[in-house]
From Swiss-Prot:
This is SIN3-HDAC complex-associated factor. InterPro entries: FAM60A. The lineage of its organism: Eukaryota, Metazoa, Chordata, Craniata, Vertebrata. One of its GO terms (cellular component) is Sin3-type complex. It is found in: Nucleus. Coiled coil: none annotated. Belongs to the SINHCAF family. The gene is SINHCAF.
């Protein structure tokens, strides 16, 4: 087995005159052979000289192979590896954008919390108002007559969509019902509780019919 061999790194004190790289996996060479092509290849407006890395040399060779009339250049490579001085100038801008995004996210979260609180407050007010209305209806129904026209009364209906000009409020043994003009019945479960009178009447009927059966049999015998 062959062991892993770390590639040798070559360094330049001043760095590459094009990209400003101070270390490379290939050797640095003198830039005199390529200085005449720097202006068109890299879009430079000033003359540069010194050491050049192998990566920039390959870019010059690629530029020479371009077809005639081509305006392509590698200007984005110029000073691309200038070192930490260039990075420090870019970091504050990134931090500003991050802080701005954090401020926006905080504002959105605050708005969401306020919206949830508003909904919870509205729900609590409606829930607290509904139980307070039910005793009012029961007291009014007990004090009032058994049947009354809802159109003439000042009470508000149990249902907001209930038409008081059509439905008539009635008090029965099991509670309060609303009866229409054609006999239809509307029941509110909060005001209507089935009583046991119907069950008692149903159980009494078979007992009353039981003693009558022998009388019929005696008449047949006579």
């Amino acid at each position: 087995m062959f062991g892993f061999r770390k590639p040798k790194m070559y360094r330049s004190i001043e760095g590459c005159c094009i990209c400003r790289a101070k270390s490379s996996s290939s050797r640095f060479t003198d830039s005199k052979r390529y200085e005449k092509d720097f202006q068109n290849c890299f879009g430079l407006h000033e003359a540069r000289s010194g050491d050049i890395c192998n990566a920039c040399v390959l870019l010059v060779k690629r530029w020479k192979k371009l077809p005639a009339g081509s305006k392509k250049n590698w200007n984005h490579v110029v000073d691309a590896r200038a070192g930490p001085s260039l990075k420090t100038t870019l970091k504050p801008k990134k931090m500003k954008t991050l802080s701005g995004s954090r401020i926006k996210s905080n504002q959105i979260s605050k708005l969401q919390k306020e919206f949830k609180r508003h909904n919870s407050d509205a729900h609590s007010t409606t829930s607290s108002a509904s139980p307070a209305q039910s005793p009012c209806y029961s007291n009014q129904s007990d004090e009032g007559s058994d049947t009354e026209m809802s159109a003439g009364s000042s009470r508000t209906p149990v249902f907001s969509f209930l038409d008081l000009t059509y439905w008539k409020r009635q008090k029965v043994c099991c509670g309060i019902i609303y009866k229409g003009r054609f006999g239809e019945v509307l029941i509110d479960t909060h005001l209507f509780k089935p009583c046991c009178s119907n069950k008692k009447s149903a159980t009494e009927k078979p007992e009353q019919e039981g003693p009558q059966s022998p009388a019929i049999s005696t008449q047949e015998e006579w």
